[in-house]
Structure formats: C-alpha cells, structure tokens
Amino acid sequence: MRSSVQPLINEIRQQFLHDLEQVQTTLELEQLKIKFLGKKGSLQGLMKELKNVEPDQRPLVGKFINELKEFMSNHCDELEHQLIAKEENAQLAHETIDVTLPGRQRFVGRKHPLTQAMDQIIHILSKMGFSVQYGPDIDTDYYNFEILNFPPEHPARDMQDTFYISPHVLLRTHTSNIQARAMELNRPPIRIIAPGKVYRNETITARSHVFFHQVEAVYIDQHVSFADLFATMDEFLKKLFKQTIETRYRPSYFPFVEPGLEVDISCLVCEGKGCQLCKHTGWVEVAGAGMIHPEVLKNGGIDPEHYSGFAWGMGLERLVMMLRGIQDIRLFTENDLRFLQQFTLL
C-alpha cells in the first residue's frame, strides 16, 4: 500500500511546485493554500488514504505526509513574504513620497495691518486713561442722528449718504452711536474709546470706500476745554507715529460739536511735497473734532451747565496709509497676500 500512496505524494508535490510558480499575488497564494492545505485540500485527501495503508506502514506514510505539509507551508511562507514586500514597493512607487525633498513651507499667519493699527491705537489711548466700548453696526436713526443733534429735517443729514435698512434702521455712519449710549449709561467723568466699522454710500476710489474703520475718543468732565483736546490729540499722534507730528487745526462744522474743527497732519508719504494721498496739498485730514455740543450732552442726560467735553473721530485706514506709505485704500479689502504679508507689527 505504501507504493500506492507514495506516487500520490510525489504527484501532489510536483503539482504544488508547478502551481506555486504561477502565483503572482498574495490573493493567488491564499487560493493555493486552500487548494493544497485547506480542509478540503489535497493534503487532507492524503490523510484520508491512511486508513487504506497497512497498520505497520501508517507511521512511515504519516511521516511522509507531514514532511510534505511542512514543505508546502515553508514554501508558502517564504513566497508570502516576497509578495508582501513586492506589493508594498509597488504601492510606494504609485504613491511616491521622496523623503529627501524639502517639506512644504508653512506660512505663519499675521494680523491684518488694520487690526495691528487698531490694537496699537487702543493700547495708546488705554495708557492715557481711556476705556474701550463697542456698539452695534446696525442701529436706529435715533442713536446715529437724532440724539447727536441731527433732528429729522436737519440739513446736516445730507452731508453723509447713508445705507438705510428701513426708514428708521441703518448701518451706522460713525461710531458716535457708541458715545450716545455711553452718556445714557454712565455719569461723568466719561473717558472712552469707540472703535469699529462705519458705512457710507460713497463711490469707491483710492481715498474712499463704502465701509471703513473709525476710532472715536470722548472725554466728558467738569472744566474740559480745547486745551485738553489739543494736548490729548498731539500726545496721541506723537505716540502713534513715534515722532513729533506737525498738526494743523481748521475750523469746521459738525452738528454734534460746537465749535468744531478738522485735524490735519503733514503728509508723511511725500513729506509735505504733494502726492495722490494728500491731493498734492502736503496735508492729510486725519480727524474731525470739537467740544461736545450742549444739546448732545442734554440728550444724553448730562447737564451742560456743569459738564463739558470733547470728542474726536478718525478714519483708521487713512492713518494706516500714512504709517505704511500706502496710497490706495482699496488694497485693504482685496485680500491679496502679496500686499498683506509685507507688514510686520507696528
């Protein structure tokens, strides 16, 4: 019986080696294992033939079968390692990552130049005793105009083109709406900064936009005078520009101050020689200012017989244009990284 089983063992061995040479993938190898080593495979068929072998020959035949099983298992394991390595290399070649190449540059974010300037202005004025207050961008006609001495039919309302949402609701045209609320909620002395966006229905040019940022400073107490306004403004500009700035105060009209004036500084872009920013005058208007009108104090619940105050407001974009030598306000809103990445902290 040994002679009848031995040829079968040799036949299975040869068939295994032949099939093994055809295997190209781990999936094909798994199918080969099932064919020869599985529960219904060729090797299991040999084990069933043991019952037909003479009892004294069974140990020897069983040894041959086990040797064949070990032979198959070793060859399968060896080929499996080779195929796994081959498939991994193929995948790496398909998804090539050259570790010797430099990594992708990570750009460090930075604050927008307007945000940098706003932070600097708030820092300076906070050191001078002012506290920061904020207010709504969308406000009522009452807080934007009426309480600030703009009666419903006042001709001064025509000075500013306004974005109206409804007949009595609008996008604020200045941050003075914060001053109005501060007077209602606080008793003098009041010393606040009112920063934020404001909106004007204007033509977009190199010097004007439909929205911009404004900072307003308000000081209300007993015996506040023009001398306090001039001293505060000059000290603020000196700290902001880090040098003594030549200023010019011109009489002007604003409904919420009396008397009113405009503050000009010598153009730092052209050093007073004339450029697009200063309209070739050598001067740039940076603020509107004045002593708070008695009617405004009265509307805010403050007795103008006992208290006085000053207020000034300035456009942030124009200040930054001076600080940075920028001649077009539109650059601030174009989100061009080539422009924005030029600026380090002030």
Swiss-Prot record:
Its EC number is 6.1.1.20. Keywords: Aminoacyl-tRNA synthetase, ATP-binding, Cytoplasm, Ligase, Magnesium, Metal-binding, Nucleotide-binding, Protein biosynthesis. GO terms for cellular component: cytoplasm. It is an enzyme of class 6 (ligase). The keyword Transmembrane helix does not apply. GO terms for biological process: phenylalanyl-tRNA aminoacylation. InterPro entries: aa-tRNA-synth_II, aa-tRNA-synth_II/BPL/LPL, Phe-tRNA-synth_IIc_asu, Phe-tRNA_ligase_II_N, Phe_tRNA_ligase_alpha1_bac, Phenylalanyl-tRNA_Synthase, tRNA-bd_arm. Its cofactor is Mg(2+). Transmembrane segments: none annotated. It catalyses: tRNA(Phe) + L-phenylalanine + ATP = L-phenylalanyl-tRNA(Phe) + AMP + diphosphate + H(+). Mg(2+) binds at E258. PROSITE patterns: AA_TRNA_LIGASE_II. CDD domains: PheRS_alpha_core. It comes from the Bacteria. GO terms for molecular function: ATP binding; magnesium ion binding; phenylalanine-tRNA ligase activity; tRNA binding. Pfam families: Phe_tRNA-synt_N, tRNA-synt_2d. The keyword Coiled coil does not apply. It is found in: Cytoplasm. Binds 2 magnesium ions per tetramer. Belongs to the class-II aminoacyl-tRNA synthetase family. Phe-tRNA synthetase alpha subunit type 1 subfamily. Tetramer of two alpha and two beta subunits. This is Phenylalanine--tRNA ligase alpha subunit. It comes from Protochlamydia amoebophila (strain UWE25). The lineage of its organism: Bacteria, Pseudomonadati, Chlamydiota, Chlamydiia, Parachlamydiales. The gene is pheS.
